[in-house]
Swiss-Prot record:
Gene3D superfamilies: Glycogen Phosphorylase B
UniProt xrefs under NCBIfam families: murG (TIGR01133)
Pathway recorded for this protein: Cell wall biogenesis; peptidoglycan biosynthesis
Protein's name according to its UniProt entry: UDP-N-acetylglucosamine--N-acetylmuramyl-(pentapeptide) pyrophosphoryl-undecaprenol N-acetylglucosamine transferase
């Protein structure tokens, strides 16, 4: 089998991405762009994974392959890995044969490995994109056989082109940090982002840190905690006597672009998409990397901005109410505006367009 290149046939992109939103949402950004250019888009993923819910809602057909990770799983799962991998290879082979893609885009997740290997076997051009600063095992292997290798952080894979992470257009369209910060006065505005599952460490420490600050200089906080932790977070604020005039606890934020735009400082984890969004929005950040992330990749993600003067990095074991209160008290809006400008300098707002263009070029090669 070879990829179709005839002008008489509609061109087809096979997207491989699954497991987490950090893989799926960037892939959706690229898929929408190519669909708007007239391409057919088919998704290879696991119907029981997050992609099984998200991808069909965005109008793309999902071809399901049963395969998942083994890290942190029991001995039975690890023992069955060879059998499960063989099944995934066979199922992926069938998908690639049926779809006959002009180009295959791997955006991460365990499903990328069997799909990528079978694409190469059948002669379909493979474009690989690594979202994190430390590449996962599947991408490290596939990078050796891919036609094009792209990365969101410089140096994540040998010889990869740094294109950034595809992010939502509304973030890149925000006014410059200089314009936003210049008109502000009064207490700092702090956005705390815990993600859909919340971040227990932030939910515990931030309320106690704010309580240590004088009420007249205390930052105004919007604290997103996730539905499962919102009641605990509100109780934490109530326990230290902080009401909604100083801290608004919310389970979700519908308009993240607006939330980033109004903030002087974001306190958050350091997942790949979060770091990329902070840079695209042009906002100062205090990163508290999740300490149990695979290969501690969140710390390396955060260093991309902290080493360039665009963010602060605080390891979770070092995060305490007193130290956080001291940090918040010492920061000025002028310092944060400078950090925000440096963050915006590292953004790659054209990432989705660049990945889409590379897919088109690879299909025509």
């Amino acid at each position: 089998m070879t990829a179709r290149v005839s002008a008489d046939l509609p061109r087809t992109l096979l997207v491989m991405a699954g497991g987490t939103g950090g893989h799926i949402f960037p892939a959706l950004s690229v898929a929408r762009l190519l669909a708007a250019r007239g391409w057919q888009v088919v998704w290879l993923g696991n119907a029981s994974g997050m992609e099984g819910q998200l991808v069909p809602k965005h109008g793309f057909p999902l071809e399901s392959v049963r395969f998942g990770g083994v890290r942190g799983k029991g001995l039975v799962t690890k023992f069955l890995l060879p059998l499960n991998l063989l099944r995934a290879f066979w199922q992926s082979l069938g998908v690639v044969r049926r779809v006959r893609p002009n180009v295959v885009l791997g955006m991460g997740g365990y499903i990328t490995f069997p799909g990528g290997m079978m694409s190469v076997l059948l002669g379909a051009p493979l474009v690989l994109h690594e979202q994190n600063s430390i590449a996962g095992l599947a991408n490290r292997v596939l990078a050796r056989v891919a036609d094009r290798v792209l990365c969101a952080f410089p140096g994540a894979l040998p010889g990869a082109e740094w294109v950034g992470n595809p992010i939502r257009a509304d973030l890149a369209a925000l006014p410059s940090p200089q314009a936003r910060y210049a008109e502000r006065s009064g207490p700092l505005r702090v956005l705390v982002v815990g993600g859909s599952l919340g971040a227990a460490a932030l939910n515990d420490v931030v309320p106690r840190a704010l309580a240590l600050l004088p009420a007249d200089t205390r930052p105004i906080v919007i604290h997103q905690a996730g539905a499962k932790q919102i009641d605990t977070l509100r109780a934490n604020y109530a326990a230290v006597g902080i009401d909604e005039t100083h801290a608004q606890a919310v389970p979700f934020i519908d308009d993240m672009a607006a939330a980033y735009a109004q903030a002087d400082l974001v306190i958050c984890r350091a997942g790949a998409m979060t770091v990329s969004e902070v840079a695209a929005a042009g906002v100062a950040a205090l990163f508290v990397p999740f300490p149990h992330a695979v290969d501690d990749h969140q710390t390396t993600n955060a260093r991309f901005l902290s080493e360039r003067g665009a963010a602060l990095l605080v390891p979770q074991p070092s995060l305490g109410p007193a130290s956080l209160a001291d940090t918040l008290a010492s920061l000025t809006r002028a310092q944060l505006a400078d950090m925000a400008a440096k963050a915006r300098e590292q953004a790659r707002p054209e990432a989705a367009e660049r990945v889409a263009d590379i897919c088109v070029a690879a299909a025509r090669a």
